[in-house]
Amino acid sequence: MNPMRDQPGSPYGDSTPRSPFSPFSPLSVDDRHRNHADTKTPRSPFSPFSPLSGDERHKSLAESKFQQALASSGQLDPLSPGSMHHGGHKFHEVFQMKQGRYDLQASKISEMMKSSSLDNAPTQSLLSVLNGILDESIERKNGEIPQRVACLLRKVVQEIERRISTQAEHLRTQNNIFKTREEKYQSRINVLEALASGTGVEHEIATQQLRQIETEKSMWEEKKKHEEEDMVKLMKQNDQHNLEISALKQELETTKRKYEQQYSQIESQTKTEKSKWEEQKKNEEEDMDKLLKENDQFNLQISALRQELETTRKAYEQQCSQMESQTMVATTGLESRLKELEQEGKVVNTAKNALEERVKELEQMGKEAHSAKNALEEKIKQLQQMEKETKTANTSLEGKIQELEQNLVMWKTKVREMEKKSESNHQRWSQKELSYKSFIDNQSQALLELRSYSRSIKQEILKVQENYTDQFSQLGKKLIELSNAAENYHAVLTENRKLFNELQELKGNIRVFCRVRPFLPAQGAANTVVEYVGEDGELVVTNPTRPGKDGLRQFKFNKVYSPTASQADVFSDIRPLVRSVLDGYNVCIFAYGQTGSGKTYTMTGPDGSSEEDWGVNYRALNDLFKISQSRKGNISYEVGVQMVEIYNEQVLDLLSDDNSQKKTLGILSTTQQNGLAVPDASMYPVTSTSDVITLMDIGLQNRAVGSTALNERSSRSHSIVTVHVRGKDLKTGSVLYGNLHLVDLAGSERVDRSEVTGDRLREAQHINKSLSSLGDVIFSLASKSSHVPYRNSKLTQLLQTSLGGRAKTLMFVQLNPDATSYSESMSTLKFAERVSGVELGAAKTSKEGKDVRDLMEQLASLKDTIARKDEEIERLQHQPQRLQKSMMRRKSIGHTDDINSDTGEYSSQSRYSVTDGESLASSAEAEYDERLSEITSDAASMGTQGSIDVTKRPPRISDRAKSVTAKSSTSVTRPLDKLRKVATRTTSTVAKVTGLTSSSKGLASSSIKKTGSTSSLAKSSKRWA
C-alpha cells in the first residue's frame, strides 16, 4: 500500500511519531490530496496548508523547530540510556561521566565511526548527539572542540545529509506511484466506455472493477486506522513537550543553586580572611601580599565568567541562524510540493467530472445494461457515504490538531516567560557582580588602613623594647589569654560531646546509660568496685582481688551516673528521646542488670513515692501529657497504656480484670502498627498522670515478685509498659503513630548466691535463659549476622521491633558497686559495651497523608469505569454472532439488502460507542493529569517510602471476539486501553508517593478489648480504638 511504511531504510523507523501533514508521513498521495482539497475545515496557522503568507509560515516553522531542537537535548539526550536503547545501539559506551561532564574517549569514537551504528541510529538521536557536543564545547572555558569530536561531528552531519537525499528519493517514488494510479483511473474510464456496447464480457469486466473498488474501500479503512495511530503519537508528543518544560524549570533551579553556592563560598572566604588578618598582626606585610594575590584571582574569575557569558551568547545566536536556514529550506520544498499536489488534484477532479458525465450517458442505455447501471448507482452511493465519513473524520482530526497547536502556542508563551525570568536573573547577578566589585574596593581600602596600622604598631613595638616594665605587662596579658583559652576548652569539649551524640543518633546505635546504685545503710562504702566516674561517660572498675593498675578496667558509655544522681537528673537526659514519640517515632527504654542493682527503682521508683522520686515511667507519661496539651491547637493526641509481663516464658496481661486467673497471651509473627505484637492485651486510654498512676499500681500489684537472699522484693518477671500515641494534624489531616516501650528486665542472678529452690529456682532458670537469648541477639546484631535468633525466647520476640527495627533504643545499665558482686558487675558491663556497638539504622517516623486516600478513591473509580467498558465490549462482541447467523439464513432466501442494512446499523452503533469511550477516556486522563500535578508537589515534602499492592484488572476478551472485524475491535478497545494507561499511571504514582497504606489503619484497627477492671477508673473506661 504505502512503500514508506515498509521501507527498511526509512530514517525515522517505525517507532518515530509522524504528523499527518508531514511529507514523510505514512499517508499516501491520495490521502494528502484529499486533506488538501477539503478547504471548508479551518486550518491552523502552524499547518503547512495554512492561508498565511510565506514569511509568516517561515517564522512560525523556524520558531517551532528551534524549540524542538532545544528541547531534544533535554528530552532525548544521546547520553541517556533511554535514547541509546531506542536507536538500538550502545551510544552510552562512547560517553562517560567525569566530574559532571561527558568525557569523549578517542578509541570509542573511532570504533563508532568505523561501525554502522550511525547509519542505523534515528535522526532525532543524531541531532541530540550534535546538540550534546555543542553544549559541551560551550561549557568549556576556551570554547574549542577537540579533533576527535570534530571528526564525529562531521560524520553525523554527513549522515543527516544522506538521509535528506534518501527522503527526496522517497518523494520521487511517491510521484511515480501517483502516475501509475492515474493510469489505472484512465483504464477504468475506458472500461466504462466499453460497457456502452452492452456485451456480456464487458459486464463481467465491470463487476471486476466493482470488486477492485471494494478492495480500495478496505484500503481506506486501513488508512483511517493509520490516521488514528498518528493522533495517538501526537498525544505522546504533547506529553513529551510537558516533560521538556519541566526539565527546563529544573535546569533553571540548578543554575540558581549554583550561583547561591558560589555566593556563600565567597562570603565564607572573606570571613576567614578577616579572622586571619586580626590574628596575625605581627606578619601583616606577608598577609597583605597574599590578599593582593587573592584579589587578582577574583578579578581573573570575574573576567572568566564574562568570557563564558559571551561565548554562550554567540553559540546561541549561531544555533538560531542554523535552525532558521534549515526551516527556510524545508518550507520552500513543502511549498513546491503543495503546488504540484494542487495541479495533480485538478487533473483528478477533471477526470472525476468526466466519469460522472459518462455515468449519465450509461443511464440512457438499453434494457440489457439496466441491471449493471443500478448496481453502479448503489456503489456510487456507498462511496459518497464513505467520503462523508472521511470528511467528518478529517474535521475531527483537524480540530484536535488545532487544540495541539494552541497548546504549542501556550508552551511558547511559557518559554518566553522563562526567558524573561532568566534575563531578570542575569540582571540580578550583574548587580551582584557590581556589589562584589564594591566589596573588593572596600577590602583594598581596608588593606591600606591595615598598612598604616602596621606602621603604627611597629613604632609601638620599638617603644616597648625600650621600656622594660611594659614587657612584663605584655607577659601578663598573654597569661590572661592562656587562661581564657583553658576555660574555652571545656565549652569545646561539651560541643564535641553533643556532636558525638548526634552522630550516634544518625547511625542508630543503641544508647547506653550506666547508673551506679548507692550503698544501702547496712553496707559499707569502703568495699566498692567503682574507682572513677567521669563526666564524659568514662567508668573505671577495679578488681578487689588484684589491687593496683593491673586490676583496673575502663569502660566508655554515652552517660554514667554517680550514686548521688537523682531521678530528675536521669530523666533530663532522656527527655528528648521520650518527646520524639509525639513526632511519630518508636522509642524503647529498658533496664538491665543483676538482681538488686536498682532497675525497678530507675524505671518505676520506690513504692508510694512522691513526685520527686518518680521513675522513668511516670515522668515520661507526665511529660507527654504536658506537650500534648501545649500542641492541642494544631494536633489532637490520643494516648493509651498497655502493661504485660513475661513470667516463666509466658506473656501475661498485668491490667487484666481477673486477677486470680491470668490469661496467657499470644505473640503475632508480624508486628502491628500499635508497637507490641500482643493484640489481646488490655489497653486503656489515659488523659492525665493520675490515670497512669492508678493503672501502674494495678500492674505492679499483679506482677510476680519474690524474696531471695540477695533482694527481699526481687522481680521474678520481665515487665513491659507500652504507651501508644496517635496524633492527627487538624490542618492537613495527616495521622502519625508513636510507641514508647518501657521495659523492666528481671535481674540476672547466680543460683548459688541467691539460694533459691523450687519455684524460685525455675523462675531463675527462665530469667537467665531469656537474658542469655537477649545476649545472643545482641551478639548477632553486633557482628551483623544474616540470621538473628529472635525466636529463642518470648523476650527477644517482643523486643524485635526495638532491636531490629527503625526505633530509637536506650539501655540503662544498673551497677551494684559492692565488691562481692564484682563478677556479675563485670559481665553486665561487658554486655553493655557490646550493646553500644550495635547499629540499628536511622529511626524513621510513621505518617499518613490525606492525598494517599484521595488517590486510592480515584483508582477505585477508574477500575469501575474499566469494568463497565469491559461489559460493553462483551455486549458488542455478541452482536456479530447474531448478525452472522441472520446472514446465513438470509443467504438461503436471497435477502442481501437486509444484510447490508443490518451491518450498517451495527457499524454506526459500534462507532457511537467508540466515540463515547474516547471522550470518557480523554476526560479521565485530563482529570488525572491535573490531580497528579497537585499531589506530586506535596508528596516531595513527605519523604515517605513504601509500596501499594494494586492488582491490575486483565481485559476480559472472549474467544468469540475473533469474529469481529478489525475495524470494530481496534476502535472499541482503544478508549479502554487509554483508561487502563491512566489506571496504571495512577498506581505507579501512589506507589512512589506513599509507603504507609499497609500500615495506615493505626490504633483504630487494632484488636483492643476490655473486659472490666478491678479499680473504679478501669470499670468506667471504654476500649481505646
UniProtKB/Swiss-Prot annotation:
Q: Bias category Basic and acidic residues: which stretches?
A: 29-41, 270-286, 950-962
What InterPro entries does the database record attribute to this sequence? Kinesin-like_fam, Kinesin_motor_dom, Kinesin_motor_dom_sf, P-loop_NTPase
Where ATP binds, per the record, is at: G593, Q594, T595, G596, S597, G598, K599, T600
Q: Name one GO cellular component term.
A: microtubule
Q: Does the keyword Cell division apply?
A: no
Q: So which domain of life are we looking at?
A: Eukaryota
Q: Which UniProt keywords apply?
A: ATP-binding, Coiled coil, Microtubule, Motor protein, Nucleotide-binding
Instruction: Quote the biased-composition stretches of kind Low complexity, using this chain's numbering.
Output: 15-28, 42-53, 963-974, 998-1016
Q: Where are the transmembrane segments?
A: none
Amino acid composition bias (Polar residues), ranges on this chain: 65-75, 901-913, 939-948
Q: Which residues form the Kinesin motor domain?
A: 509-838
Q: List the disulfide bonds.
A: none
Q: Which family does it belong to?
A: Belongs to the TRAFAC class myosin-kinesin ATPase superfamily. Kinesin family. KIN-14 subfamily.
**PANTHER family according to UniProt:** KINESIN-LIKE PROTEIN KIN-14P (PTHR47972:SF50), KINESIN-LIKE PROTEIN KLP-3 (PTHR47972)
Protein's name in the database:
Kinesin-like protein KIN-14P
Organism source for this protein?
Arabidopsis thaliana
Tell me what gene encodes this. KIN14P
